[in-house]
């Protein structure tokens, strides 16, 4: 029996460790291309709670219609586990729909189908009891997805964007983009996922002469998948599953970046961000790296640790956004 606290055994286990496929979660507005993104994944099988993939010619469960109960969603994952040959990606479309089926399941199981409390009858919405129970069921879904992932199958969960109220200990509360689902359940998904991307377009806001309110104008027709999270959106990449701050919303683009070495992707991103920065920012970088030329900066970055490059990229993004 292996001593679980044997350092030599830990080193040997680390050398044998194989990186599993990513757990990718994407939230975005309806119609932006999330389902098309998933359908372009090789060896994909959809689990449907809505019929967005019907015209795309991809295998999907259930064969006809969509999952109508929470148990059917879990059963679909079991079906993949029973016949995993040829499956490279499982795509849940959508997580919002699965979450609503989960809530209905809890309401029927624990509250006899009563959503709103009445005199002497406690409903799903009483003291958030229903949502708390639902979040535990969402953890059950994530565990089921991990069983599939252990068979070397990537997990992709798609859903619609909503607004989540975020508390701020140092100022006024604010809203941020995230999956349109109950916050407790969404937080469990956020913690579980290796990558969370926000599918969106780029907008600019401004007031025209004589107008009192600013209007949003789409900058171009490009659709992006943003992995750089912050106060405005929930997005992230776990170490080992690093991606650029944003990529074109295309599975081919995603796959090409995913295959690149993490450090190489970050170093290239850092150099691109520096090239697009103001002279002031470039001077700060040169000073920090004790470099006098762009070539010396590039050489320094090529030998940096992954963590240090990531810190630089985050700083450059924040400064470029502030200046822009």
Could you tell me what each predicted segment is?
Residues 2-9, 16-23, 28, 32, ...:
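Interfaces that engage single-stranded nucleic acids at replication/repair/recombination sites
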Residues 25, 89-91, 156:
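Structural motif
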Residues 35:
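Walker A/P-loop
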Residues 44, 50-54, 95-97, 161-165, ...:
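Conserved nucleotide-binding/hydrolysis micro-motifs of P-loop NTPases
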Residues 44-46, 155, 196-198:
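Short, well-ordered beta-strand core segments
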Residues 54-116, 128:
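Conserved nucleotide-sensing/catalytic segment adjacent to the nucleotide-binding pocket
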Residues 97-185:
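P-loop NTPase motor core
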Residues 166-273:
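Conserved GTP-binding G-domain of TRAFAC-class P-loop NTPases and closely related GTPase folds
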